[in-house]
Amino acid sequence: MFDWQQKQLQHITKAGANLPHALLLNGASGIGKHAFALGLSKALLCNKPTAQFLACGTCPSCTWFAESAHPDFRLIEPEDADSADDAPKKKTTKKRQISIAKIRQLVDYLSLSSHQVNARRVILISPAEVLNNASANALLKILEEPPENTLFLLVTSQMQRLIPTIISRCQKIDMPKPTRADALAWLQTQQVSNAENVLDYARGAPLLALQIAEEGDVIITMTKQLALGAKLDPFASAPIFLGVGMERAIDTLQKWIFDLITFQHAQVLCFNTAYGNAFQALSKSVNLNLLLTFQDKLINAKKTADHPLSNEVQLENILLQYTQLFKPI
Protein backbone atom coordinates (compact mmCIF):
# COMPACT_ATOMS: atom_id res chain seq x y z
CA MET A 1 0.00 0.00 0.00
CA PHE A 2 1.04 3.62 -0.49
CA ASP A 3 0.88 6.68 1.76
CA TRP A 4 -1.76 8.35 -0.42
CA GLN A 5 -4.16 5.44 0.18
CA GLN A 6 -4.46 5.77 3.96
CA LYS A 7 -7.87 7.46 3.88
CA GLN A 8 -9.35 4.62 1.82
CA LEU A 9 -7.78 2.02 4.12
CA GLN A 10 -9.24 3.73 7.20
CA HIS A 11 -12.68 3.89 5.55
CA ILE A 12 -12.61 0.15 4.92
CA THR A 13 -11.21 -0.84 8.32
CA LYS A 14 -13.88 1.19 10.16
CA ALA A 15 -16.45 -1.22 8.77
CA GLY A 16 -14.78 -4.06 10.66
CA ALA A 17 -16.97 -7.15 10.61
CA ASN A 18 -19.64 -5.21 8.70
CA LEU A 19 -17.72 -5.11 5.44
CA PRO A 20 -19.95 -5.53 2.38
CA HIS A 21 -19.53 -8.71 0.37
CA ALA A 22 -17.98 -6.83 -2.57
CA LEU A 23 -15.82 -3.71 -2.97
CA LEU A 24 -15.13 -2.01 -6.29
CA LEU A 25 -11.82 -0.11 -6.27
CA ASN A 26 -12.09 2.46 -9.04
CA GLY A 27 -9.47 4.94 -10.22
CA ALA A 28 -6.96 5.92 -12.86
CA SER A 29 -4.46 3.42 -14.19
CA GLY A 30 -1.03 3.41 -12.58
CA ILE A 31 -1.90 4.80 -9.13
CA GLY A 32 -1.49 1.60 -7.10
CA LYS A 33 -5.00 0.13 -6.92
CA HIS A 34 -3.81 -3.42 -7.45
CA ALA A 35 -1.09 -3.06 -4.81
CA PHE A 36 -3.70 -1.66 -2.42
CA ALA A 37 -6.02 -4.60 -3.08
CA LEU A 38 -3.22 -7.10 -2.47
CA GLY A 39 -2.21 -5.35 0.76
CA LEU A 40 -5.81 -5.25 1.94
CA SER A 41 -6.28 -8.94 1.11
CA LYS A 42 -3.14 -9.85 3.04
CA ALA A 43 -4.24 -7.79 6.06
CA LEU A 44 -7.75 -9.27 6.06
CA LEU A 45 -6.33 -12.78 6.10
CA CYS A 46 -3.50 -12.04 8.56
CA ASN A 47 -3.67 -13.80 11.94
CA LYS A 48 -2.12 -10.82 13.76
CA PRO A 49 -2.74 -7.56 11.85
CA THR A 50 -1.15 -4.41 13.26
CA ALA A 51 -3.05 -1.56 14.89
CA GLN A 52 -2.83 0.26 11.53
CA PHE A 53 -4.50 -2.77 9.92
CA LEU A 54 -1.44 -3.91 8.03
CA ALA A 55 -0.38 -7.53 7.69
CA CYS A 56 2.19 -8.64 10.29
CA GLY A 57 4.30 -10.42 7.67
CA THR A 58 5.31 -13.26 9.98
CA CYS A 59 2.24 -15.38 10.77
CA PRO A 60 1.41 -18.57 8.81
CA SER A 61 -1.21 -16.69 6.78
CA CYS A 62 1.31 -14.04 5.70
CA THR A 63 3.82 -16.76 4.83
CA TRP A 64 1.27 -18.48 2.60
CA PHE A 65 0.44 -15.16 0.98
CA ALA A 66 4.09 -14.34 0.32
CA GLU A 67 4.46 -17.71 -1.39
CA SER A 68 1.30 -17.12 -3.50
CA ALA A 69 -0.15 -20.21 -1.87
CA HIS A 70 -2.82 -18.93 0.52
CA PRO A 71 -5.71 -21.43 0.48
CA ASP A 72 -8.30 -18.74 1.31
CA PHE A 73 -7.22 -16.25 -1.37
CA ARG A 74 -7.81 -16.31 -5.10
CA LEU A 75 -6.53 -13.84 -7.70
CA ILE A 76 -8.61 -13.80 -10.88
CA GLU A 77 -6.78 -12.06 -13.72
CA PRO A 78 -6.28 -12.34 -17.50
CA GLU A 79 -4.15 -15.15 -18.85
CA ASP A 80 -1.40 -12.68 -19.85
CA ALA A 81 -1.65 -10.54 -16.72
CA ASP A 82 1.34 -9.21 -14.84
CA SER A 83 0.10 -7.53 -11.66
CA ALA A 84 -2.86 -5.96 -13.44
CA ASP A 85 -3.09 -2.21 -13.81
CA ASP A 86 0.20 -1.34 -12.12
CA ALA A 87 2.50 -3.37 -14.33
CA PRO A 88 3.57 -3.16 -17.97
CA LYS A 89 1.16 -4.88 -20.30
CA LYS A 90 2.74 -7.87 -21.99
CA LYS A 91 3.61 -7.51 -25.65
CA THR A 92 0.93 -9.69 -27.16
CA THR A 93 -1.68 -9.61 -29.88
CA LYS A 94 -3.88 -12.12 -28.07
CA LYS A 95 -7.21 -11.07 -26.71
CA ARG A 96 -6.72 -9.92 -23.12
CA GLN A 97 -9.69 -10.99 -21.03
CA ILE A 98 -10.87 -12.97 -18.01
CA SER A 99 -12.48 -16.05 -19.47
CA ILE A 100 -15.61 -17.90 -18.37
CA ALA A 101 -13.35 -20.84 -17.49
CA LYS A 102 -11.74 -18.81 -14.70
CA ILE A 103 -15.12 -17.96 -13.17
CA ARG A 104 -16.21 -21.60 -13.39
CA GLN A 105 -13.05 -22.57 -11.53
CA LEU A 106 -13.95 -19.94 -8.95
CA VAL A 107 -17.43 -21.42 -8.53
CA ASP A 108 -15.86 -24.83 -7.85
CA TYR A 109 -13.47 -23.27 -5.35
CA LEU A 110 -16.26 -21.45 -3.50
CA SER A 111 -18.21 -24.69 -3.14
CA LEU A 112 -15.50 -25.89 -0.75
CA SER A 113 -15.11 -24.85 2.87
CA SER A 114 -12.45 -22.33 3.84
CA HIS A 115 -9.10 -23.77 4.89
CA GLN A 116 -9.34 -22.32 8.41
CA VAL A 117 -12.52 -22.86 10.40
CA ASN A 118 -14.98 -19.95 9.95
CA ALA A 119 -12.21 -17.97 8.23
CA ARG A 120 -12.80 -15.23 5.70
CA ARG A 121 -11.94 -15.82 2.06
CA VAL A 122 -10.88 -13.04 -0.30
CA ILE A 123 -11.37 -13.06 -4.07
CA LEU A 124 -9.44 -10.39 -6.00
CA ILE A 125 -10.52 -9.73 -9.60
CA SER A 126 -8.14 -7.40 -11.41
CA PRO A 127 -8.61 -5.70 -13.79
CA ALA A 128 -12.35 -6.30 -13.68
CA GLU A 129 -13.03 -4.44 -16.94
CA VAL A 130 -11.59 -7.33 -18.97
CA LEU A 131 -14.33 -9.73 -17.91
CA ASN A 132 -16.03 -10.81 -21.12
CA ASN A 133 -19.82 -11.06 -21.40
CA ALA A 134 -19.97 -14.69 -20.34
CA SER A 135 -17.60 -14.35 -17.38
CA ALA A 136 -19.25 -11.10 -16.25
CA ASN A 137 -22.68 -12.73 -16.17
CA ALA A 138 -21.29 -15.76 -14.34
CA LEU A 139 -19.69 -13.49 -11.74
CA LEU A 140 -22.95 -11.58 -11.37
CA LYS A 141 -24.71 -14.79 -10.36
CA ILE A 142 -22.14 -15.28 -7.59
CA LEU A 143 -22.50 -11.69 -6.38
CA GLU A 144 -26.30 -12.01 -6.32
CA GLU A 145 -26.01 -14.90 -3.84
CA PRO A 146 -22.58 -14.42 -2.28
CA PRO A 147 -21.13 -17.18 -0.09
CA GLU A 148 -20.69 -16.42 3.60
CA ASN A 149 -17.42 -14.98 4.93
CA THR A 150 -16.22 -14.13 1.44
CA LEU A 151 -15.10 -10.70 0.28
CA PHE A 152 -14.85 -9.86 -3.41
CA LEU A 153 -12.42 -7.11 -4.42
CA LEU A 154 -12.86 -5.81 -7.96
CA VAL A 155 -10.21 -3.44 -9.32
CA THR A 156 -10.86 -1.27 -12.36
CA SER A 157 -9.55 1.77 -14.20
CA GLN A 158 -12.42 1.67 -16.73
CA MET A 159 -15.60 1.28 -14.71
CA GLN A 160 -17.74 2.17 -17.73
CA ARG A 161 -16.82 -1.21 -19.24
CA LEU A 162 -18.40 -3.13 -16.35
CA ILE A 163 -22.02 -4.20 -16.65
CA PRO A 164 -24.22 -1.96 -14.45
CA THR A 165 -25.59 -4.87 -12.44
CA ILE A 166 -22.11 -5.82 -11.24
CA ILE A 167 -21.44 -2.22 -10.20
CA SER A 168 -24.73 -2.12 -8.28
CA ARG A 169 -23.71 -5.23 -6.31
CA CYS A 170 -20.52 -3.60 -5.05
CA GLN A 171 -19.65 -0.77 -2.70
CA LYS A 172 -17.56 1.62 -4.78
CA ILE A 173 -14.33 3.02 -3.35
CA ASP A 174 -12.79 5.84 -5.38
CA MET A 175 -9.01 5.46 -5.32
CA PRO A 176 -7.18 8.80 -5.62
CA LYS A 177 -4.12 9.94 -7.45
CA PRO A 178 -1.48 11.15 -4.99
CA THR A 179 -0.69 14.83 -4.71
CA ARG A 180 2.11 15.95 -7.00
CA ALA A 181 4.44 16.28 -4.01
CA ASP A 182 3.68 12.74 -2.79
CA ALA A 183 4.08 11.29 -6.29
CA LEU A 184 7.43 13.01 -6.82
CA ALA A 185 8.64 11.92 -3.39
CA TRP A 186 7.79 8.30 -4.21
CA LEU A 187 9.45 8.49 -7.63
CA GLN A 188 12.60 9.78 -5.95
CA THR A 189 12.64 6.65 -3.77
CA GLN A 190 12.58 4.67 -7.03
CA GLN A 191 15.57 6.68 -8.32
CA VAL A 192 13.68 8.04 -11.34
CA SER A 193 15.57 10.82 -13.07
CA ASN A 194 13.64 13.67 -14.69
CA ALA A 195 10.71 12.71 -12.43
CA GLU A 196 8.68 15.88 -13.01
CA ASN A 197 8.53 15.47 -16.79
CA VAL A 198 7.81 11.76 -16.55
CA LEU A 199 5.03 12.36 -14.01
CA ASP A 200 3.46 14.98 -16.27
CA TYR A 201 3.53 12.54 -19.18
CA ALA A 202 1.84 9.94 -16.95
CA ARG A 203 -0.90 12.44 -16.00
CA GLY A 204 0.07 12.31 -12.33
CA ALA A 205 0.02 8.50 -11.98
CA PRO A 206 3.30 7.56 -10.26
CA LEU A 207 3.40 3.84 -11.05
CA LEU A 208 2.72 4.59 -14.69
CA ALA A 209 5.44 7.24 -14.55
CA LEU A 210 7.88 4.63 -13.27
CA GLN A 211 6.93 2.32 -16.13
CA ILE A 212 7.39 5.11 -18.67
CA ALA A 213 10.80 5.94 -17.20
CA GLU A 214 11.83 2.30 -17.59
CA GLU A 215 10.60 2.33 -21.21
CA GLY A 216 12.24 5.67 -21.99
CA ASP A 217 13.97 4.62 -25.22
CA VAL A 218 10.78 3.14 -26.67
CA ILE A 219 8.71 6.24 -25.86
CA ILE A 220 11.35 8.49 -27.44
CA THR A 221 11.37 6.35 -30.59
CA MET A 222 7.57 6.47 -30.82
CA THR A 223 7.37 10.24 -30.43
CA LYS A 224 10.15 10.76 -32.96
CA GLN A 225 8.08 8.75 -35.44
CA LEU A 226 5.00 10.88 -34.74
CA ALA A 227 7.07 14.02 -35.27
CA LEU A 228 7.48 12.95 -38.91
CA GLY A 229 3.82 13.73 -39.57
CA ALA A 230 2.84 12.78 -43.13
CA LYS A 231 6.26 11.16 -43.66
CA LEU A 232 5.67 8.51 -40.97
CA ASP A 233 5.67 4.95 -42.38
CA PRO A 234 2.67 3.20 -40.74
CA PHE A 235 3.87 -0.30 -41.59
CA ALA A 236 7.39 0.20 -40.28
CA SER A 237 6.21 2.08 -37.18
CA ALA A 238 3.39 -0.23 -36.03
CA PRO A 239 5.71 -2.92 -34.55
CA ILE A 240 7.57 -0.21 -32.61
CA PHE A 241 4.33 1.06 -31.07
CA LEU A 242 3.16 -2.47 -30.26
CA GLY A 243 6.34 -2.89 -28.24
CA VAL A 244 4.52 -1.25 -25.33
CA GLY A 245 1.16 -2.94 -25.99
CA MET A 246 -1.91 -1.71 -27.86
CA GLU A 247 -3.43 0.27 -24.99
CA ARG A 248 -0.20 2.14 -24.22
CA ALA A 249 0.39 2.78 -27.93
CA ILE A 250 -3.02 4.42 -28.27
CA ASP A 251 -2.41 6.39 -25.08
CA THR A 252 0.82 7.77 -26.56
CA LEU A 253 -1.07 8.78 -29.70
CA GLN A 254 -3.81 10.44 -27.63
CA LYS A 255 -1.27 12.55 -25.76
CA TRP A 256 0.40 13.58 -29.02
CA ILE A 257 -2.94 14.56 -30.59
CA PHE A 258 -3.98 16.43 -27.45
CA ASP A 259 -0.77 18.44 -27.65
CA LEU A 260 -1.36 19.14 -31.35
CA ILE A 261 -4.80 20.54 -30.53
CA THR A 262 -3.62 22.68 -27.61
CA PHE A 263 -0.65 23.92 -29.63
CA GLN A 264 -3.00 24.96 -32.44
CA HIS A 265 -5.16 26.95 -30.02
CA ALA A 266 -2.72 28.33 -27.46
CA GLN A 267 0.86 27.33 -28.36
CA VAL A 268 0.88 25.09 -25.26
CA LEU A 269 2.28 21.56 -24.85
CA CYS A 270 1.12 19.45 -21.90
CA PHE A 271 2.91 16.13 -22.47
CA ASN A 272 5.49 16.27 -25.25
CA THR A 273 7.28 19.39 -24.05
CA ALA A 274 10.59 18.47 -25.72
CA TYR A 275 9.07 18.65 -29.21
CA GLY A 276 8.24 22.34 -29.55
CA ASN A 277 9.91 22.66 -32.95
CA ALA A 278 8.13 19.58 -34.29
CA PHE A 279 4.72 20.84 -33.17
CA GLN A 280 5.49 24.25 -34.66
CA ALA A 281 6.05 22.59 -38.04
CA LEU A 282 3.18 20.09 -37.81
CA SER A 283 0.64 22.71 -36.75
CA LYS A 284 1.18 24.54 -40.05
CA SER A 285 0.01 21.58 -42.13
CA VAL A 286 -2.50 19.77 -39.90
CA ASN A 287 -6.22 19.95 -40.63
CA LEU A 288 -7.95 20.83 -37.34
CA ASN A 289 -11.32 19.29 -38.25
CA LEU A 290 -9.65 16.00 -39.18
CA LEU A 291 -7.59 16.24 -35.99
CA LEU A 292 -10.69 16.43 -33.79
CA THR A 293 -12.32 13.54 -35.65
CA PHE A 294 -9.15 11.47 -35.26
CA GLN A 295 -9.14 12.19 -31.52
CA ASP A 296 -12.63 10.65 -31.28
CA LYS A 297 -11.44 7.62 -33.25
CA LEU A 298 -8.62 7.09 -30.76
CA ILE A 299 -11.09 7.16 -27.86
CA ASN A 300 -13.12 4.42 -29.55
CA ALA A 301 -9.99 2.47 -30.44
CA LYS A 302 -8.90 2.43 -26.81
CA LYS A 303 -12.26 0.94 -25.80
CA THR A 304 -11.66 -1.98 -28.16
CA ALA A 305 -7.94 -2.44 -27.55
CA ASP A 306 -8.62 -6.05 -26.48
CA HIS A 307 -10.35 -6.96 -29.77
CA PRO A 308 -9.12 -10.30 -31.18
CA LEU A 309 -8.44 -8.72 -34.60
CA SER A 310 -4.70 -8.39 -35.16
CA ASN A 311 -3.48 -5.40 -33.17
CA GLU A 312 -0.79 -4.79 -35.77
CA VAL A 313 -3.40 -4.39 -38.53
CA GLN A 314 -5.45 -2.03 -36.34
CA LEU A 315 -2.42 0.05 -35.47
CA GLU A 316 -1.23 0.25 -39.07
CA ASN A 317 -4.65 1.62 -40.01
CA ILE A 318 -4.59 4.16 -37.15
CA LEU A 319 -1.10 5.36 -38.07
CA LEU A 320 -2.10 5.61 -41.73
CA GLN A 321 -5.00 7.85 -40.72
CA TYR A 322 -2.56 9.90 -38.64
CA THR A 323 -0.38 10.63 -41.68
CA GLN A 324 -3.48 11.77 -43.58
CA LEU A 325 -4.12 14.52 -41.02
CA PHE A 326 -1.33 16.50 -42.63
CA LYS A 327 -2.39 16.13 -46.24
CA PRO A 328 -4.47 18.78 -48.01
CA ILE A 329 -8.20 18.00 -48.31
Where are the regions a protein language model picked out?
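Charged, glycine-rich active-site and insertion segments that engage polyanionic ligands
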Residues: 1-43, 51, 60, 148-151, ...
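Structural recognition of the conserved hydrophobic beta-strand(s) that form the central parallel beta-sheet
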Residues: 122-126, 139, 150-156
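Residues immediately C-terminal
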Residues: 130-131, 145, 161
